[in-house]
Amino acid sequence: MIKNIGVDQIEVDRIAKVVDRGDGFARKVLTDREFAQYQDLTHKRKIEYLGGRFAIKEAFSKAWGTGIGQAVSFEDVETLRTESGAPVTTSRIFTGRIFSSIAHDDHEIVAVVVLEEPAGWRRAIGKLLHLLSGRKK
C-alpha cells in the first residue's frame, strides 16, 4: 500500500553555481557512497547527479511529511546508480519500498519518490496498539 508521494524540482543553474564553488555542498548533501560516485563524473554530470540526489532527498522528506530537518536528514536517504544508470533509493529511517525517478533537461531537475509501506505494516501496528492498550478481545 502506498504511504505517500513526494515531488521536488530544482533549477539546473542553482546547482551549477554550487558545483562551481567546490565540493562543500556536495559533501553536505551526499552520503559517502553517493560522493564516491559523484567524484568520478564530468562537470555536466556532477550538476545532474548532485541536483538529482538533492531533489530525491527533498522529495523523500515531503513524502515523509516533514521536509529536511530534524526528522529527515540528507544522510537518511541514499540514491545510487545501477550499472544501467537507474537510481536505486534506500533509507535508514524507512523500511518499506522506495520508488524513485529523476528527470532533467537543460533548465530543470525533477524527482519523484513513492513510499510503499512494508507488507503487513498496518496489521502489525494494529496488533501492537491492541496489546499496549491492555484491552481484551
UniProtKB/Swiss-Prot annotation:
The EC number(s) this enzyme carries: 2.7.8.7
CC per GO annotation: cytoplasm
Pfam families found in the cross-reference section: ACPS
Residues annotated for Mg(2+) binding in this entry: 8, 58
One GO biological process term: fatty acid biosynthetic process
Keywords assigned: Cytoplasm, Fatty acid biosynthesis, Fatty acid metabolism, Lipid biosynthesis, Lipid metabolism, Magnesium, Metal-binding, Transferase
SUPFAM superfamilies from the UniProt entry: 4'-phosphopantetheinyl transferase
Catalytic activities: apo-[ACP] + CoA = holo-[ACP] + adenosine 3',5'-bisphosphate + H(+)
Major location category of this protein: cytoplasm
Signal peptide residues on this chain, from the entry's feature table: none
Highest taxon above the source species: Bacteria
GO MF annotation terms: holo-[acyl-carrier-protein] synthase activity; magnesium ion binding
Location(s) in or outside the cell: Cytoplasm
Function: Transfers the 4'-phosphopantetheine moiety from coenzyme A to a Ser of acyl-carrier-protein.
The family this protein is said to belong to: Belongs to the P-Pant transferase superfamily. AcpS family.
Descriptive protein name: Holo-[acyl-carrier-protein] synthase
Source species of the chain: Lactobacillus delbrueckii subsp. bulgaricus (strain ATCC 11842 / DSM 20081 / BCRC 10696 / JCM 1002 / NBRC 13953 / NCIMB 11778 / NCTC 12712 / WDCM 00102 / Lb 14)
